Amino acid sequence: MNSASVSGESSLSDMIQTVHFSSGNPRIGETRGVMHLISDNAVSSSSSSSSSNLPIGRNPLVCVLGVPNHMTYADFCQFCGSFIQHILDMRTVRNDDIENRYSILIRFDSQESTDTFFQHFRGKQFNSLDEDVCRLLFALDVQFTGYSGSIDHTQPSAAGPIEQPTCPVCLERLDQDTGGILTTMCNHSFHCSCISNWPDSSCPVCRYCQQQPENSVCCVCQTTENLWMCVICGVVGCGRYKEGHARRHWEETEHCYSLELETQRVWDYAGDNYVHRLIQSKTDGKLVELNSHGSLSKDGCGSCEYSDSGMTDALLNSKVDMIISEYNELLQAQLENQKQYFEKLLQNVKEETEQKISEAASKAISQRLQKLQTRFDRCVKEKQFLEDLNENLVKNKDVWSTKITEMKEREKKAVRAKDEKIQGLEEQLGNLMAQMDGESEVSETKEVQDATVSTTNTSSSGAGNVIHANKKKSNRRKG
């Protein structure tokens, strides 16, 4: 038993993952710590919802790793859904080795709720538009290792009463029995229901934002050097000393003004010069270049310098107003060009869409017509076959009608011949019968004569017998 427990503890220790984290506003104070998580290898890959697939020795504490920075606290509370009522507290921390992401430690009111939450949200996407999935791990313990900052975090004396903190939004007590508590990255605590109504990712108290600004890169080659931004649409591209994607954007869209991000100077591709220092002359209304010493370029009046600071400020403000007005006019003209450009694009898209719809309709009609033509050809062939069959049947009918007529004639002739033959045979039979009767009468007469001569002494009884015999013979002839 002891060896089995030792082996189980060693296998569990092999599956423990150590993650270093920090929290707090780095400008004020930062708390560092380490948390021990049960790695994914300890969790069974089976899709069964049974708790037997979960690691042994787990606690009602889980960690959501790698939450995107663009996901606000309200978004995450909405993602948790109905499980929010089983959460005691949530703490947002910053991972040391992961950029633009944060992690959340969640403690539940029971192990059953923790297991259900783990099985339901493990590997689930945060939203349908984001490819990031929820990576959940069970946490064994969380340890704070140190603090660095300008604020002294000394522990209060244990002798005095400790006042329970309140929510900065609703000013109610932060009690886990009444609702879950969420601690932000800057170590400010709120009710989950209160922070769910906060629209952005900043802290409602100190406005610390966990989402850091992104570095500008070229939208094509992703370089970070020699970048120019289009003044009209904001597209960032690299300059001519790299791959020239900013100039290519001007050639494609005709947006001629581009801002150099490093020096904040504006370049005009159409005029092939800088336009950020152009002002309008009051004498003739022409655009002239602003001198760095506060003087104007030669416009027929020579150059002037002002020693009065008030006059210099007024002139500078006037020049700034003129530059702003000129910039607004240029921007309006570019916006009008942009409008025409996109209207043209929309018209082209509309025409292409109509053309595709027409082609699809023509293709569908052509396929339908082809099917109907195939069916028509099959029907024509079937009709021709039936006509040929009918013609053959008509011909066969005539032939067989002739044969039947001939057979009837032959049958009539045969019957007539048989009748004639039978009639002739009957006549022959009658003659033969008559001849036989005549011969029998002649023979009887001769016998009578012979009997009369030979029996002269017959008695009356014998004569009676002779008479009776003659009657029988006569009857037989008649029969």
Swiss-Prot record:
Catalytic EC class: transferase
Zinc finger motifs (UBP-type), residue ranges: 201-294
Positions contributing to Zn(2+) 1 binding: C218, C221, C238, H245
Pfam families xref list: BRAP2, zf-RING_2, zf-UBP
Region (Disordered): 434-479
Compositionally biased spans, kind Low complexity: 451-466
Effect of a null allele: Viable heterozygous plants seeds are slow to emerge from the seed coat; emerged embryos remains white with unexpanded cotyledons thus leading to growth-arrested seedlings.
Listed EC numbers: 2.3.2.27
GO BP terms in the entry: protein ubiquitination; regulation of seed germination
Reaction it catalyzes: S-ubiquitinyl-[E2 ubiquitin-conjugating enzyme]-L-cysteine + [acceptor protein]-L-lysine = [E2 ubiquitin-conjugating enzyme]-L-cysteine + N(6)-ubiquitinyl-[acceptor protein]-L-lysine
Zinc finger regions, RING-type: 167-207
Job of this protein: RING-type ubiquitin E3 ligase that binds ubiquitin and is required for seed germination and post-germination growth.
Name used for this protein in its record: BRAP2 RING ZnF UBP domain-containing protein 2
